[in-house]
Every structure is written in structure tokens, then in C-alpha cells.
Amino acid sequence: MNLKPLNDRVLVKRLESEEKTAGGLFIPDTAKEKPSRGEVVAAGPGKVAEDGKLIAMTVKKGDTVLFSKYAGTEIKLDGVEHLVMREDDILAIIE
């Protein structure tokens, strides 16, 4: 399925969380939190300002981003969990 976000919305695929801690301890699935970073799969054209001008998106397809824990709306595309969120919900681009 192909999904094209509108306006300032972004489609993000969550990246897998770490399997073990820095100290080498394995984290069981029941103790893992949903990861708060992901890869931008698609991005809309941007937000329309009050004066009618288009404000271009900062993020682009392929960017790895950090977002808040409760950001976006969860959807499944081809059996894979994704999030649709506004660009404002993205906290940072990881370089």
C-alpha cells in the first residue's frame, strides 16, 4: 500500500529498540518501551501559513528522527507498524 501524507504530516516507521543494555543485560519484551525514534518513510509538502505561502518541511524521506513517546497515530501498512504525526511532534533529526 502506498500512503502520501498531507500538509505537514509525516509517516514514520519505528526503529527497533535495543535488545540489551550498555552493561550487557538483555531486556525482555515485557520490559521494553516502544521506541521513540524512527525513519521517515514519507512526508507531506508542508504547512500553509496564514498568508497562503507554503512552509516547506524540514524532515525528508530517509531521515532518522526522535519523537515524543505519545506522538502520532499508529497505523499498520502491509503488516508493519507506522506512525502518522505532524512535523511539530518530531523533536530532532538524528545525524
From Swiss-Prot:
SUPFAM superfamilies registered for this protein in UniProt: GroES-like
GO cellular component, one term: cytoplasm
GO biological process: chaperone cofactor-dependent protein refolding
Coiled-coil stretches: none
InterPro entries: Chaperonin_GroES (IPR020818), Chaperonin_GroES_sf (IPR037124), Chaprnonin_Cpn10_CS (IPR018369), GroES-like_sf (IPR011032)
Compartments reported by the entry: Cytoplasm
Any Pfam family the entry gives: Cpn10
GO molecular function: ATP binding; metal ion binding; protein folding chaperone; protein-folding chaperone binding; unfolded protein binding
Cited CDD domains: cpn10
Keywords from the named record: Chaperone, Cytoplasm
Origin superkingdom: Bacteria
Primary location class: cytoplasm
Matches recorded under Gene3D superfamilies: GroES chaperonin
Its biological purpose: Together with the chaperonin GroEL, plays an essential role in assisting protein folding. The GroEL-GroES system forms a nano-cage that allows encapsulation of the non-native substrate proteins and provides a physical environment optimized to promote and accelerate protein folding. GroES binds to the apical surface of the GroEL ring, thereby capping the opening of the GroEL channel.
Subunit organization: Heptamer of 7 subunits arranged in a ring. Interacts with the chaperonin GroEL.
Family stated for the protein in its record: Belongs to the GroES chaperonin family.
Protein known as: Co-chaperonin GroES
